[in-house]
């Protein structure tokens, strides 16, 4: 491809509304253009990268035995009402009416549509297991679209759905999809982690997210430094570092703390180690009108997902108001603790290993110092309540946890019978009786993968594409293309490279575009390999080569270039 026949729309300045690096670089490199909030047009350069990601996803899905279909983007309300999600999904679901006043939605996901397809097309156990997938544009009416393609309203997604007679069959397909996803992200050249995850609004039982590691990620993920263990921070089990509780060495005393309403104030004013303090959070109980206290160490954070999953706690999690707390306990937030607490309490594991700790006295402006379990008060119910922190023991017993930011690019679920039961999706089993199908679903944000790759691969000059995603493999830049000798050599080399199967962008812009601008554009776009043709090089029988990730320029004998590139690019 020649730039004279291409849309090369690079920008020198970064648009003011672009916050994350992928958004900035995709706009500056001329890959996308904003149409409206959360809506983007893919320009030719960006579309090449997107199609490469899509092709790898399709190849691995086909290899894993999934069957490609294409479902409508517009879905009838009746299907969503049948599953119960029409009311549950919320304002992210864009609802529309046709001219006959029939209700539809623009699909953010396709569980209902595929379940309807399955119940109409599948009738016998002999057709199972089966796994359908599509690569299609989705729409979610995000309240605050931001970060370009990272959180847009319209996006390209690969979603797959499998149907099974047994949990064992589902597990086999789930494992196959897990491996297919690992293959996809490995082929894309990304540093990623599959992590145990909460199932969220999709529902179901088992769940894994796939995260590309990047500082701009919205999720915290925890993984072992010595094994394959990894989990979303919402899901990661918090194992205390301490093995046993130290013996008590202080007397219990009641201390006036009128100006210490927070852990930070208590620690600062009294010189306490923060790990020797606890905080008591009061939430609504599962039983109406009942409050429950959740107690974690002062330097730890309550994990709201874990808390909401407790049998005694209302879900979704709801914190009690100050008025409710005062009515039940007689003191306000900031002065609460486990001693003489008149409501049920659940403490985190780490709290049970404390000795000589400080806690609110359930009297405004007062705390107990030197508290000790079993001497001063019995241990209440114990549960895993907190977020893990870096350095915690890995739950699999191997090494310590590292916490990094991640961008979620894939998610797989074991749905169970949530949708098939609601929508009466059954087949005849071996005994001739109807059997409700067990489902799995498997999603990849294809357009988000492209943005995530940039978040992980860039420098001060532009994008550093992984080889598999680069829009072009080679940038061919002639110096003085108006020179007959340079033009002839460049055109001949371009033809040879294309004939050898390489994707080449020939920068044939005229002399009004300086070599420096050409080099800067090719680096901004992120083409992995650059070849320069010059009069001096031709006189010496050499071509100038520079890898995008390298600082040094090499002089390559012109006769050896194809072999050289074959070794570098892997042909």
Curated annotation (Swiss-Prot):
Pfam families: HGTP_anticodon, tRNA-synt_2b, tRNA_edit
Enzyme Commission no: 6.1.1.15
CDD domains with a match to the protein in the record: ProRS-INS, ProRS_anticodon_short, ProRS_core_prok
PROSITE patterns per the UniProt record, alphabetical: AA_TRNA_LIGASE_II (PS50862)
UniProt feature coiled coil, ranges: none
Keyword Membrane: no
Keyword Ligase: yes
Matching InterPro entries: aa-tRNA-synt_IIb, aa-tRNA-synth_II, aa-tRNA-synth_II/BPL/LPL, Anticodon-bd, Anticodon-bd_dom_sf, Pro-tRNA-ligase_IIa, Pro-tRNA-synth_IIa_bac-type, Pro-tRNA-Synthase_IIa_type1
Stored SUPFAM superfamilies: Class II aaRS ABD-related, Class II aaRS and biotin synthetases, YbaK/ProRS associated domain
Known catalytic reactions: tRNA(Pro) + L-proline + ATP = L-prolyl-tRNA(Pro) + AMP + diphosphate
Any GO BP annotation: prolyl-tRNA aminoacylation
Subcellular location, record wording: Cytoplasm
Broad enzyme group: ligase
Keywords assigned: Aminoacyl-tRNA synthetase, ATP-binding, Cytoplasm, Ligase, Nucleotide-binding, Protein biosynthesis
Its biological purpose: Catalyzes the attachment of proline to tRNA(Pro) in a two-step reaction: proline is first activated by ATP to form Pro-AMP and then transferred to the acceptor end of tRNA(Pro). As ProRS can inadvertently accommodate and process non-cognate amino acids such as alanine and cysteine, to avoid such errors it has two additional distinct editing activities against alanine. One activity is designated as 'pretransfer' editing and involves the tRNA(Pro)-independent hydrolysis of activated Ala-AMP.
Domain notes: Consists of three domains: the N-terminal catalytic domain, the editing domain and the C-terminal anticodon-binding domain.
Subunit and interaction comment: Homodimer.
Entry similarity comment: Belongs to the class-II aminoacyl-tRNA synthetase family. ProS type 1 subfamily.
Protein name according to UniProt: Proline--tRNA ligase
Organism: Azotobacter vinelandii (strain DJ / ATCC BAA-1303)
């Amino acid at each position: 491809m020649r730039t004279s026949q291409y849309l090369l729309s690079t920008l020198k300045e970064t648009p003011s509304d672009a916050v994350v690096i992928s958004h900035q670089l995709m706009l500056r490199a001329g890959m996308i253009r904003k149409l409206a909030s959360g809506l983007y047009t893919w320009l030719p350069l960006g579309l090449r990268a997107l199609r490469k990601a899509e092709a790898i996803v399709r190849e691995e899905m086909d290899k894993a035995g999934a069957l490609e279909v294409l479902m409508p983007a517009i879905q009838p309300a009746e299907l969503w009402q049948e599953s119960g999600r029409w009311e549950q999904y919320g304002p992210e679901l864009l609802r529309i009416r046709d001219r006959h006043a029939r209700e539809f939605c623009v699909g953010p996901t396709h569980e209902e549509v595929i379940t309807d397809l399955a119940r109409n097309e599948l009738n016998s156990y002999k057709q199972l297991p089966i796994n359908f997938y599509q690569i299609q544009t989705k729409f979610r009416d995000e309240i605050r679209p931001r970060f370009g393609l990272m959180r847009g309203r319209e996006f390209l997604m690969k979603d797959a759905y499998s149907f099974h007679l047994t949990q064992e069959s589902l597990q086999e397909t789930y494992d196959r999809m897990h491996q297919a996803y690992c293959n996809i992200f490995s082929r894309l050249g990304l540093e990623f982690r599959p992590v145990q995850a909460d199932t969220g609004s999709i529902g179901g039982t088992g769940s894994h997210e796939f995260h590309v590691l990047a500082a701009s990620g919205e999720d915290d993920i925890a993984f072992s430094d010595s094994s394959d263990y990894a989990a979303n921070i919402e899901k990661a089990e918090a194992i205390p570092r301490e093995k046993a509780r130290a013996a008590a060495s202080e007397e219990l005393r009641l201390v006036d703390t009128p100006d210490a309403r927070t852990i930070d104030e208590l620690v600062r004013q009294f010189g306490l180690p923060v790990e020797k303090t606890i905080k008591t959070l009061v939430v609504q109980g599962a039983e109406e009108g009942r409050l429950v206290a959740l107690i974690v160490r002062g330097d730890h954070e309550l994990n709201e997902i874990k808390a909401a999953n407790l049998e005694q706690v209302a879900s979704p999690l709801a914190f009690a108001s100050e008025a409710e707390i005062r009515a039940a306990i007689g003191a306000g937030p900031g002065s609460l603790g486990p001693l003489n607490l008149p409501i049920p309490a659940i403490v985190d594991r780490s709290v049970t290993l404390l000795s000589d700790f400080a806690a609110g006295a359930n009297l405004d402006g007062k705390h107990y110092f030197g508290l000790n379990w079993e001497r001063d008060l019995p241990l209440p119910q114990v549960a895993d309540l907190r977020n893990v922190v870096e350095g915690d023991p890995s739950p699999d017993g191997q090494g310590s946890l590292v916490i990094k930011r991640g961008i979620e690019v894939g998610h797989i679920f074991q749905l169970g019978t949530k949708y098939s039961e609601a929508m009466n999706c059954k087949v005849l089993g071996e005994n001739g009786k109807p059997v409700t199908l067990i489902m799995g679903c498997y999603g990849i944000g294809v357009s988000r993968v492209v943005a995530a790759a940039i978040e992980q691969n860039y420098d001060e000059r532009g994008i550093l594409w992984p080889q598999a995603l680069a829009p072009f493999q080679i940038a061919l830049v002639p110096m003085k293309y108006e020179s007959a000798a340079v033009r002839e050599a460049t055109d001949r080399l371009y033809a040879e490279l294309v004939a050898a199967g390489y994707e080449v962008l020939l920068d044939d812009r005229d002399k009004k575009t300086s070599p420096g601008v050409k080099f800067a554009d090719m680096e901004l776009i992120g083409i992995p390999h650059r070849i320069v043709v010059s009069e001096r090089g031709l006189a010496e029988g050499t071509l100038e080569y520079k890898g995008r990730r390298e600082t040094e320029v090499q002089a390559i004998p012109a006769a050896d270039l194809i072999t050289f590139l074959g070794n570098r690019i892997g042909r």
